[in-house]
Amino acid sequence: MEFWFSEFHTPDVKHSIRVNKQLYSKQSDYQRIDIFETPEFGRVLTLDGNVMLTERDEFIYDEMIVHVPMAVHREAKDILVIGAGDGGVVRELTRYDRVAVSYTHLTLPT
């Protein structure tokens, strides 16, 4: 039997991804957290049924959210990242020697 994750955008549109295995599933105090292993996108993180990131394309989001502002604000030194997620934004910020990075995020339940 095939296993698919579907994200519903409108009543007439959904995006589906074939899943090899569900790696994690938990309802936290804040949201439903699921992690899937997929053949096309690698690991996929969903929150409340919405895709947040995939291994295959996370760099696109992280690079754009970091390097565009850093190019505009060349004197940035102290940076606070709220909602650090997978750590990709923090990873990209560490490419800049001049910055000190602090971050915070919700802790996943154990």
Located regions from the model:
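Conserved SAM-binding loop of SAM-dependent methyltransferases across substrates and taxa
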Residues: G88-Y96
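N-terminal auxiliary segments of SAM/dcSAM-dependent transferases
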Residues: M1-P39
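Short, aliphatic-rich beta-strand segments
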Residues: G42-D48
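Conserved class I S-adenosyl-L-methionine
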Residues: A76-G83
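Conserved alpha-helix/loop element of class I SAM-dependent methyltransferases that forms part
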Residues: I60-E75
